[in-house]
A protein has these predicted regions:
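Interhelical loop/hinge segments that connect adjacent transmembrane helices in multipass membrane
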Residues: 1-5, 144, 169-177, 189-209
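Membrane-interface junctions at transmembrane-helix termini in multi-pass inner-membrane proteins
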Residues: 6, 126-149
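Alpha-helical transmembrane segments of multi-pass membrane transporters
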Residues: 20-28, 94-99, 150-171, 186-191
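Alpha-helical transmembrane segments of multi-pass membrane proteins
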Residues: 51, 55, 89-93, 109-133, ...
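Membrane-interface helix-loop junctions in multi-pass transport and translocation proteins
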Residues: 31-41, 111-112, 140-145, 155-187
Length: 209
């Protein structure tokens, strides 16, 4: 048991270290390709998304952690996950649709043009789903998959970014935003594939709640 815990800590720690090393190596390269102004806008984009996800979770991510081990059955965990994720999804969908309409009607201004603003809303939604997906992976103590998803997101972001820079003639801020959004989507797909027993909620046993 002790060796298993240490192994999981080591795997997660190794994934974190790899992510940090990738960041240390690639950030200076990216900042040489794009101007500080554009990279600053991208940082604001990412910050907006991170704050929005924290708010839109409504604390249900903590509720998932709190009640996940109450029962060990897959049906209970799937039902719990469904009940924790559905309200943030509903709220975020409604809110992002409303904000999209208000933005495109120029009623509110979110500091970006329409294409970047649209991608911001898409990215927020993807990040929200990914947050719950990776949380379940961690709660299932699947340290290898957890590290794989985190590292692959960073690697996919860089691969997609350099592909866009090399072969597509698009705005550099748009390239950064597209890359991070697609990388998030790919990581989410990995989570859906490997945790499909949790996501495939066919019947809800309301008696459990």
């Amino acid at each position: 048991m002790k060796n298993s815990i240490l192994k999981q800590i080591f795997v997660i720690g190794a994934g974190t270290i790899i992510n940090v090393l990738i960041g240390i190596i690639t950030v200076p390269i990216i900042t040489r390709i794009v101007s500080p102004e554009i990279y600053g806008q991208f940082t604001i984009f990412d910050t907006y998304a991170s704050v929005a996800v924290l708010v839109l979770c409504l604390g249900f991510d903590q509720a998932l952690v709190r009640f996940y081990y109450v029962e060990d059955s897959s049906n209970y965990k799937s039902t719990l996950f469904y009940n924790c994720v559905k309200y943030p999804i509903i709220l975020s969908t409604v809110l992002l649709i409303v904000l999209s309409i208000l933005t495109f009607l120029n009623i509110i201004d979110i500091d970006f043009d329409n294409s970047i603003t649209f991608l911001l809303f898409v990215y927020i939604f993807l990040q929200l789903l990914l947050r719950f997906s990776t949380l379940v992976i961690r709660l299932e103590q699947n340290s290898k998959l957890f590290s794989f998803v985190n590292v692959s997101q960073r690697v996919n972001y860089l691969v997609i970014l350099f592909f866009i820079f090399r072969f597509l003639n698009v705005d550099k801020l748009l390239a950064l935003v597209l890359s991070i959004s697609l990388a998030c989507l790919i990581s989410l797909i990995f989570g859906l594939i490997f945790q499909k027993n949790i996501w495939n909620h066919l019947e809800i046993e309301k008696d459990n709640f």
